[in-house]
Each structure stands twice: as C-alpha cells, then as structure tokens.
Amino acid sequence: NNIDVNGDSITVLNYGYIRKQYMAILIQNDAGEWQYFSVNGDNVYVSGEFSGGRKFNDIAVGEFDSPQEFLNSPYNSYGASDDMSINTYGFSEGYMIPTSKEQDDIIRDTFISISKNESYDFLGNNCSTVVQKSLEAAGIITFTQKSTRHRIPSSHYLGESSFIATISTSRPVIPSVSFRAIIKNNPQGKMIYR
C-alpha cells in the first residue's frame, strides 16, 4: 500500500465502534495541506443531556502537513463540543484512499454543499452519510449495493396472490459500519493510527 501522503488522497476518520461513534474526513486543499471536514449533527437534548455533536459544522478547519500530523495534533482531542480549539472527538484511526486532485475538489465541493444546503437527519443525512455521499460523487465506492428478490407466497384466505418483492441494501448510517464498508470497497487504501 504505497500511498503518497504528499500527493492526492483523502483520509476517512473513524471514532468508536460501540456506543459513541463518529465519522469525518480530511481533504487536501490546493496547497497540498490536509483540512478537517465534519457534519456535527444538531446537538439536541435527549434523555437529560445534549447529544449529536456540535451546534455547527467544521468546514476546512486547519492545515496539516499529513493525516498523521492531524491525528497527533492538539486539535484532534476529545472534549467539550463548544471548544473551538479541538474537534471534540479525538480520532485514533483513519483510512487513506488515493484520489486525484479532481476527485479531491469534487469531494470538498460536495461535502460543503451538503453541509450548507441539507438539514441534519440522523437516518438520512448524518456524519457518516455526508462523507459517503461526498466520496460517491467523486466515483469512490462506499458500500456494495445488493438487491435480493423474495417470493411472497399467496394467501387464498386473505384473497392475495403470490408476488415478488425486491429488497435493496441502502447506504449504512452507522459510522463504524460505513468505515468498514469503505475499507472493504477500497482495498488500495492504508490504515493510519494515532
């Protein structure tokens, strides 16, 4: 897995596998520096506490020489969601995928457009799906779409004849599931750790 970290590539960031999970992305800018992009939710009050991330999105935050520099930076720290000096997650891993400059531009523009124009929705437009949609816009496969057909038998008692139902898989919404699907569909990438 020889990926030129000074060339064109993106890094998908993953936080957590069990209860608290999150996904964000590092995208290179025109100067070749890595910037942090994150759709943070809406920080709603649920069960006696605020959850869902910050009340704002992080768009093109910082300039880091490499994904490793980002992971090891003070900015990549766990803490209060209103602390602008940190990302509040403290990611410990990422997956670098080689891209072209054109793909970087598409990923960046798509991420910014979604974050500005679409409301946060836990099941349809969350931290994980925004990263996936941005990658997909640049031609990067993020999950395997499958369709299965099921024959539903007739029920003469109910007056129904048999029929075929087609069920398609959809984009994963859980960050750790999305992260594993991105890795599976992009084996040319490379894991990095803090």
Which residue stretches match the model-derived regions?
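Glycine-rich catalytic cores of cysteine/serine-nucleophile enzymes that process amide/ester linkages
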Residues: N1-F91, D121
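Short coil/turn linker and secondary-structure boundary residues
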Residues: G62, T99-E102, N125
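Activation targets extended, charge/polar-rich intrinsically disordered C-terminal tails
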Residues: D104-R194
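Proline-rich intrinsically disordered, low-complexity coils
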Residues: P67, P74, G79, P98, ...
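A structural motif
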Residues: S81-T110
